[in-house]
């Protein structure tokens, strides 16, 4: 009995220790953005983790920080009325390295909040994290995370929860989850429209993820799955989100070295941003609502998309198997040149050795199911499902889709439209608008096998001479 009592007392004490709050103002942080409170924040995080876990609490007020590193069993809680600003001085950002190898980790990276190989971490509350990312200029085509910080980055971590917080104004991608397992993201509000490469959310080679009830407004892509290493994105659900994007609202790609398997996308509302005061990429009404891409090798399979409500976008649905062939490894000299070019801001004279190694194998897209999609006020590009000669897209099933768009294509336009399609553009960056308006007002299908349509209808605002469906090299 005494042994049992001792054990229970130990367990209660352990739980109490884990539940402890570390309020940053108790450790010297002040609501004052004239100076950073990085050291205090990091002290609280380290103490919390060392003592078995608990909450690091940011109370109401305005605070400024440079890079902080999260630890296992830490719950970062932002109270209502709390705003944590990122420093606008790059000297306050630490260059971080990781043992995980991917296209995005060959060089040290900078981010406001970073975690590597952690377990059981939570970021939540009704406060705000603001990266103040507009002050970091784009210096070269590959400077994301090198001269412009991510706001939030998790690498090879497990049991991650991000809930209810507002995230805004990152220097590049807002959130990058790389090779993470068991991630839950819900109820967050993301505004990222102040710089180039302003994605709202990037899941990269992650497993067992649920993204739900997210409100996202981004200049670049909205909710994006990537694969910048051989590790697939697998067993991921994206549901009940509202997304505004000048580019692709929901996207699988562009990096696809591993690929995507068992992906569910449902209950998504896509609409143009109410704020059109600035634009770095894309189109005011968005480029696409749904982009499914394999262009760097890899396989996409078992993707189910349902219940999309779309306002705008130039080309609502884009399925593309291409062969850009960008790998995830570098020669050593190439990696050094890659970061040196980014830091110098130079774009000229980039040689092949400065770019990632090539992928020789064309990837694969198969078993895609798209159902119950409603589109209104779209552009007149049309939708497309395209592979390459001898590399068809396979088993794509589209049902219960209605699209209303601008229309207006005339007989005199068809020659130019068909001429543009003579170029397969196999190695080009995939974009739903890459060929211009398509030969079909509804769906253009090329190099495909086992594609089916059921209850698909396209109507146009202005008369449009194109047929609803055009298929080439289709079995």
Predicted regions and their residues:
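Extracellular/periplasmic carbohydrate-active domains that bind, remodel
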Residues: 16-475
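Bacterial N-terminal signal peptides
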Residues: 5-14
């Amino acid at each position: 009995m005494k042994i049992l009592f001792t054990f229970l007392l130990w367990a209660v004490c352990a739980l109490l220790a884990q539940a402890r709050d570390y309020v940053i103002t108790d450790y010297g942080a002040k609501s004052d953005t004239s100076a950073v409170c990085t050291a205090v924040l990091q002290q609280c995080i380290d103490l919390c983790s060392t003592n078995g876990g608990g909450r690091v609490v940011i109370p109401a007020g305005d605070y400024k920080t440079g890079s902080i590193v999260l630890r296992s069993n830490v719950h970062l809680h932002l109270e209502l009325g709390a705003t944590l600003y990122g420093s606008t001085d790059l000297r306050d950002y630490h260059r971080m390295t990781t043992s995980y190898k991917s296209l995005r980790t060959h060089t040290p990276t900078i981010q406001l909040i970073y975690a590597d190989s952690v377990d059981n971490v939570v970021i939540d509350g009704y406060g705000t994290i603001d990266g103040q990312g507009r002050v970091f200029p784009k210096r070269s085509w590959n400077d994301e995370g090198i001269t412009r910080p991510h706001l939030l980055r998790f690498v090879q971590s497990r049991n991650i929860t991000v809930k209810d917080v507002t995230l805004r104004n990152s220097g590049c991608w807002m959130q990058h989850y790389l090779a993470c397992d068991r991630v839950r993201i819900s109820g967050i509000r993301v505004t990222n429209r102040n710089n180039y490469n302003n994605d709202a959310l990037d899941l990269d080679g992650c497993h067992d993820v649920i993204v739900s009830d997210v409100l996202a407004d981004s200049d670049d892509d909205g909710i994006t799955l990537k694969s910048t290493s051989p590790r697939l994105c697998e067993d991921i659900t994206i549901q009940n989100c509202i997304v505004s994007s000048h580019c692709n609202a929901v996207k699988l790609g562009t990096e696809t070295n591993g690929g995507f398997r068992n992906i569910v996308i449902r209950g998504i509302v896509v609409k143009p941003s109410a704020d059109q005061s600035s634009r770095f990429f894309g189109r005011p009404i968005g480029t696409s609502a749904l982009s499914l891409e394999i262009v760097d090798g890899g396989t996409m399979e078992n993707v189910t998309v349902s219940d999309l409500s779309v306002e705008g976008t130039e080309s609502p649905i884009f399925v593309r198997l291409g062969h850009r062939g960008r790998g995830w490894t570098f020669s050593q000299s190439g990696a050094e040149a890659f970061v040196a070019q980014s830091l110098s801001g130079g774009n000229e004279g980039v040689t092949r050795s400065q770019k990632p190694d090539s992928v020789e194998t064309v990837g694969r897209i198969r078993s895609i199911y798209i159902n119950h999609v409603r589109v209104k006020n779209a552009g007149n590009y049309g939708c497309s499902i395209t592979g390459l000669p001898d590399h068809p897209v396979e088993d794509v099933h589209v049902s219960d889709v209605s699209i209303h768009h601008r229309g207006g294509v005339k007989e005199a336009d068809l020659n130019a439209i068909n001429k543009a399609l003579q170029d397969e553009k196999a190695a080009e960056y995939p974009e739903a608008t890459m060929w211009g308006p398509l030969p079909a007002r509804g769906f253009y299908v090329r190099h495909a096998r086992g594609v089916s349509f059921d209850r698909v209808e396209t109507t146009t605002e202005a008369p449009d001479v194109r047929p609803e469906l055009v298929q080439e090299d289709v079995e």
